[in-house]
Each structure stands twice: as C-alpha cells, then as structure tokens.
Amino acid sequence: MKLGEHEMKSNQSVADEIRKYMNYIYLILFAGITMWYYLYSTVLEYKYPYALYLGLRYALMAYVLVSIALVVWQKQYSTVLEPVFMVLILVSAGIVTYAVKDYGVFDFALLLVGAKNVPWKRIAYVYLCIAVVIQGIAYYASTTGIIADITMQADRGVRHSMGIIYPTDMAAHVLFIMLVYAALREKKLTFVEITMMGVVSYW
C-alpha cells in the first residue's frame, strides 16, 4: 500500500471516530436544550438553571463550528454551496435574534445545522422520550392539583392545558409527539394506534 493511501485511510478513520463521538455530543446538547424549551412551555414550578442553558448553548455553538469545519475538511457536502448555506442560516438567525431579542430562533438554527450527519432516528427518539416524560409529569401534576390547569372556553366546551401554559400549546405538543411516533414506526399504524390518536386529538 502506498504511503499516500495509508495516510488517507488513517485520516478517514480518525474523522469517522470524531464524527461518532460528535453524534453523541449533539444528542446530549439537543436533549438539554429541548428540556429547557419544553419545561419553559409548562407551568411546572421546577426552574431549569439558566446558567446551564447558557452553557449548553455556547457548547452547541462550538459544536456547530467544529461540525462545519469537519464538513469542509472531509468534503461531506453534495454541492459547494451546502456549507455556505449552513453559514447563511446561522447568520440570518443571528440577525433575527438580534432584532427581536429572542434566542429561540438562533437556538433552532444551531440545532438544525448541527444535526447534519446525525441519524434522524436518534434525534427523534431523544425528543420523543423527553416530550413524553415531561408531558406525563405535567399532566399528572395538573390533574392532581399540584399545579394549575389553565382552561379556555371554546365552541365545543372547555379546553384544558394539562399543565402546559396554554391549551393550544398543549395540543401542539401532543400533535408533535404523535407525528414523531408515527415517523419512528416507519410502517402503517395499526387500527388501535389510529383510534387512540383520534381519541387523544379530539380530547
């Protein structure tokens, strides 16, 4: 084997090893930030440490920079414009964040760009686990009187928030949970599953 080919394989092996660990790092950061925003949408009294959230965001920013550098170094893009587009997403999100003073836009852009080369199933599974656990805790707390159950009068009756800050937000959370579950199944849902989803949606 030629020396040049050996070096190329060695570099590829190192890059693959780095990418594997970076996938785990991304999932940890994704989990932490998802928990922050999900808890923020509930009326649970637990206060997620803001310092921890800031640390996660800065770590995610560093991760994204390293990720883009690896994409360019290993030429892991379909066109030359792909890394440019990734940078433009971050710049645009940064401008919007500066204008509206809402870091949610920039955080979402960081998570979007950082997700490149991370298996989507792992991301979806992490989200589903976090969403189901927090939603379940919020539901239990609201139905047992531990926290307030915010209600809203609608045409078909009273709508309950089930521990979320607003009934429509709760409906959105439940919808996302069902969509992610259906996507992870990757096959036709059973009649029982469809019926349960219909009942939950109506409720």
Labelled PLM ranges:
Residues 17-37, 56-74, 81-203:
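Hydrophobic transmembrane helix bundles of membrane-integrated enzymes that assemble
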